[in-house]
Every structure is written in C-alpha cells, then in structure tokens.
C-alpha cells in the first residue's frame, strides 16, 4: 500500500517532472524525492487545516517541494551552450552534452567556487560563473580536440 501511495503521490510526480527538466542527475535519488514529496504533502495538509484555500496551500507546498532547487547547474550549462556555442553545438546537442559536462572535473571545480543558492541567478556572481563556464567549455573543446559543427568559427 505504501508503495502505491508513493507512486501515485501528486507531489512526488510533480517533483520528479521538475527534476527531469532541471536536475536530470537527481531524478533517481528516491530517498530525497520521497522525503521532499512527503514534506510538501504535510505542508499542504497543514495549510488546509489552518484554513488556507487549496490554491494557497498548493503555493505553500510548492515552496517546500522546490526549496533549494531554483538554481540549476544543468539549466546554467544548457544556457551557456545555447547562447555561446549556438553555431558550434546546435540543438539538441546542448541538452545531450550537458550531463557529460556536469561530470567533468573542470566544470565541477568552476561551480564549486560559488555558493549556489536559490537566488544565485539574480546575483552579480552569476555573470562571473557564466563567463568562467564559457571559458572552461572552450578549453575542454580545444584541449580534447572535440568536433563541433562549423569548427572554424571557434574563437
């Protein structure tokens, strides 16, 4: 019965869909997903019990569900690849390359220099991270002689 409840959990499905889009590397973290979905359900039930409307309770539950997940390394890398390497790596290459880049030690070390909070994308530090990631990706492509579309356009 518990397994069925987890499989049919609205908040679990909502979180899994979100992770699939923004944190594909975390989709299989079942312990995290289960705990967070349960916390969101508790927040929702508590809000309803306190007299909040269903839409208000949904907002409160979503805050719990997505806490710490608003800034995505995956989304940042896809953005860098799409914006800075549009000619060299046309769609769908950015989405396919990003999971590999997330595992790259040089890329990981760039991210490790920054405190990546939910609102990091709105800070001045974001531009520094973006620039550093762009340079790191250029180096990865050059050092490893990776093929790109229109390689002659690489700077």
Where are the predicted features?
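C-terminal alpha-helical interaction appendages
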Residues: 1-155
């Amino acid at each position: 019965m518990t397994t069925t409840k987890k499989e049919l959990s609205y908040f679990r499905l909502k979180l899994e869909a979100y992770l699939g889009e923004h944190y594909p590397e975390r989709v299989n973290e079942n312990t995290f997903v289960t705990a967070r979905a349960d916390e969101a359900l508790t927040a929702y039930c508590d809000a309803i019990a306190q007299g909040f409307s269903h839409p208000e309770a949904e907002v409160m539950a979503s805050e719990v569900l997505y806490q710490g997940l608003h800034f995505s390394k995956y989304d940042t890398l896809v953005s860098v690849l799409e914006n800075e390497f549009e000619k060299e790596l046309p769609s769908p290459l950015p989405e396919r390359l990003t999971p590999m880049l997330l595992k790259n030690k040089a890329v990981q070390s760039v991210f490790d220099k920054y405190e990546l909070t939910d609102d990091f994308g709105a800070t001045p530090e974001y531009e520094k991270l973006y620039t550093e990631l762009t340079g790191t990706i250029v180096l990865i492509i050059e050092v490893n002689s990776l093929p790109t579309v229109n390689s002659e356009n690489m700077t």
